[in-house]
A protein has these predicted regions:
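Short, glycine-/small- and polar/acidic-enriched structural segments
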Residues: 1-89, 95, 112-125, 129-142
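Short helix-loop capping/hinge motifs at secondary-structure junctions, enriched
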Residues: 21, 87, 153-162
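Short acidic active-site motifs
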Residues: 101-102, 120
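Hydrophobic residues within well-ordered alpha-helices
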Residues: 105-107
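Periplasmic-binding protein-like
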Residues: 129-158, 166
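Secondary-structure end/capping motifs
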Residues: 161-272
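Conserved C-terminal helix/tail region of periplasmic/extracytoplasmic solute-binding proteins
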Residues: 241-333
Length: 333
């Protein structure tokens, strides 16, 4: 069972704005200014220009930090760079490290950039060692990130408890999504037992009003992180299959079998059952063509009130899991 409770636009790609050592991926005089010279205006919307500028700035292999080698941060990074002609992860050095240590790693010259959820990118900016290059939303505008996952046998044996978990996540997301809850949420998360960070830095991520560099430049990203609107927590099987398709291609796995298994992991049936009776407007479908929604679009739903946000990939590709499977079967025959 999988129930997403956060959307990857809350992630950001952060770049060192200091000089690096001779063995770094960027030349000694590289940094934020060189990327601007290479055409990146830090407008937070153009992932193609940002990626091309980053690739052009490298002298050797880029060193990029991610929280886990198998994570949405890594998948977005691989998709982005590979689409621009830099094979990933083969063409870059991916370093796994805890998010709270990433700003320190940038400062120490251990990595050139990192991709992780906020507020850790903003901490690099606060410490004067990094700049925010672009949000994950500019790579895939409505991608999944975090999951609530349990074993399928446990979900079957503990139907009541698993349903309560789903409802708790749903209600929490709905509350956090309310703008009036942001300041309190930031204050709670700032406590020493949680993030132990200034609440104003956390609030930036919740609002999407970001300071992106030590120059004090600001960018506002609508929907930077989503907790509720647009069926944000709905476990779309097509999103699970997109992840499986990427992994299968990179690791040499059977694509058809990978997509089949991925569809069994995301469980919209459990999600619907857990939220039945609370007047929540859920999608009528459990899968969709990923990357096909250009503007907010009404879709078939239980009460006819649901609108899905844009879900475009930066390169305008789409992913249709059914077509992918049909193509694989046809190729076999």
């Amino acid at each position: 069972m999988t129930d997403r409770y956060r959307i990857a636009p809350g992630a950001s790609v952060s770049l060192a704005d200091r000089t690096t050592d001779d063995d770094g991926g960027l030349d000694k005089d590289e940094g934020e200014d060189r990327l601007r010279d290479n055409g990146h205006g830090f407008d937070f919307r153009d992932a193609r220009t940002a990626g091309e500028a980053l690739i052009a700035a490298k002298v050797d292999r880029l060193r990029i930090g991610v929280p886990f080698p198998l994570s949405m941060h890594a998948e977005l990074l691989y998709y982005w760079l590979s689409s621009l002609g830099l094979p990933a992860p083969q063409g870059v050095d991916i370093k796994t490290m805890p998010p709270p240590l990433m700003a320190d790693a940038i400062e120490a010259g251990e990595i050139d950039a990192f991709c992780v959820g906020e507020p850790w990118g903003s901490i690099a900016v606060e410490n004067g060692v990094g700049a925010l290059l672009l949000p994950g939303k500019s790579i895939w505008s409505f991608s999944p990130e975090k999951v609530l996952a349990v074993r399928s046998d446990w979900a079957s044996a503990e139907t009541g408890l698993s349903a309560r978990l789903i409802r708790a996540v749903y209600r929490s997301g709905r509350w956090i999504a309310d703008p009036e809850s942001r300041l309190l949420t930031a204050e709670l998360l700032s406590r020493p037992e949680y993030l132990d960070l200034p609440p104003e830095v956390i609030e930036r991520a919740l609002s999407g009003n970001l300071i992106i560099s030590s120059r004090g430049e600001q960018r506002t990203v609508d929907g930077f992180v989503g907790f509720h609107k647009g069926a944000a927590n709905f476990p779309w099987r097509s999103q699970a299959q997109w992840i499986a398709n990427q992994l299968a291609a990179r690791m040499g796995l059977d694509r058809e079998e990978s997509l089949r298994q991925a569809a069994q992991v995301f469980r919209p049936d459990l999600y619907r059952a857990a939220l039945e009776g609370i007047a929540l407007d859920l999608p009528g479908a459990s899968s969709k063509i990923e990357g096909s929604i250009e503007v907010e679009t009404p879709v078939a739903s239980e009460y006819g009130r649901l609108t899905l946000p844009p879900d475009l990939f930066f390169d305008r590709r789409t992913f249709d899991p059914d077509a992918t499977i049909r193509s694989k079967i046809t190729h076999k025959n």
